Amino acid sequence: MWVHPAGNVLIDPLPLNEHDENHLDSLGGAAHLIITNSDHVRDTARILLFTGAKSWGPHAEKEQFPFDCDDWLKDGDKPVSNIEVFCMEGSKTPGELAILIDETTLVTGDIIRAHEGGRLCMLPVEKLQNRELAVNSIKRIDAVKSIEAEIPGDGWPIFKNGHDALIELAEKL
């Protein structure tokens, strides 16, 4: 969750238990909920009922997404101030989203992961739709020099030197 003056933003939330719901409520609830790809829907429908948040999903998955979002995001969209959307082509789902917050924190769905502390890796090749497009998407993100933190949908977050970790990943590809 990102605490934001225009309402808190949830990105790919996990299912919430009663304690989580109470804690979220104590922080002001959630006004916005972004799903990076259809594999991260999880308990979103129930969370939306609980919070009343506006929901966004990847535009490229609009026709087959498991539920109707309030709006659909494409590359370059800015659904909330200080959030920029990147579409990560070639991943396991069409138009997977990566979310850049305050130009310093990157939240990714599945294409970029971290199964080892301090090191990023790419989704295994056999799960990619198109390796070349996936690599190009990652290299496009590594051009954002202001990234300090990288929070992958799968694995360990990197809280310092996120840009360096992205460059290291891109060089391995």
Language-model features, listed with the residues they occupy:
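Metallo-beta-lactamase
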Residues: 2-16, 26-30, 57, 64-65, 84, 88-173, ...
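Short, hinge-like loop/turn segments at secondary-structure boundaries
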Residues: 50-54, 72-76, 168-169
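Short secondary-structure transition/capping segments
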Residues: 46, 67-70, 162-163
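Active-site metal-binding motif and surrounding structural segment of the metallo-beta-lactamase
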Residues: 15-58
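Short gly/pro/ser/thr-enriched loop/turn and capping motifs at secondary-structure boundaries
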Residues: 41, 62-65
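Alpha-helix initiation and capping sites
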Residues: 38-41, 79, 93
